[in-house]
Design a protein with these regions (language model features):
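Negatively charged
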Residues: 1-181
Length: 181
């Protein structure tokens, strides 16, 4: 697959697909992975070694991939600009993505919405370019990490950001929310 540059919706709705044999795919030229595994409810393939450094959009990539919980810690996502919905309803995902460079992302809309198992340290994420954090953690019932150091000064929308995030109990009083409408 080394010549492929778009993998949008490749396994979308493939509910029985488990992802066996994907670990050695050369995806280094792929720029789009939107909805790639969306609704692939049994997908839990090892894609930890994928070179995703050319990818610019991961919109809804693992949305409702209920079984997915693989190591993505080594992924270089520095060119990604769109991660909206990426882990929405990914019920099992609780991977370490603390080192992800999300500095080019401007919207965190529904990134962890209903990601019921996710509770990882993302305090070092550079979110200074983000303007939309609406519906980012709703129903993320396990999430309770200290994100007080985030620079949210450019965010204009935080609607429903922690709606139903029943475990979240962190002090975010230092956030500059002066631009939130």
């Amino acid at each position: 697959v080394s010549g492929v540059n778009r993998m949008d919706a490749m396994f979308k709705d493939a509910s029985e697909f488990e992802g066996i044999g994907l670990q050695n795919w050369d995806v280094s030229n792929v720029t789009r992975m939107s909805t790639m595994f969306a609704n692939a409810t049994n997908f839990n393939g090892d894609i930890s070694n994928w070179d995703v450094s050319s990818v610019t959009t991961m919109y809804s990539m693992f949305k409702e991939a209920d079984a997915f919980n693989q190591d993505l810690s080594s992924w270089d996502v520095s060119n990604v600009t769109n991660i909206q919905w990426i882990f929405c309803n990914a019920d099992s995902f609780n991977g370490d993505i603390s080192t992800w460079d999300v500095s080019n992302v401007t919207s965190m809309y529904r990134v962890f919405s209903s990601a019921s198992s996710f509770n990882q340290d993302i305090s070092s994420w550079d979110v200074s370019n983000v303007t939309d954090m609406s519906v980012m953690f709703p129903q993320a019932v396990s999430f309770n990490q200290d994100i007080s150091s985030w620079d949210v000064s450019n965010v204009t929308n935080m609607g429903y950001m922690f709606y139903g995030a029943s475990s979240f109990n962190q002090d975010i009083s230092s956030w500059d929310v002066s631009n939130v409408i």
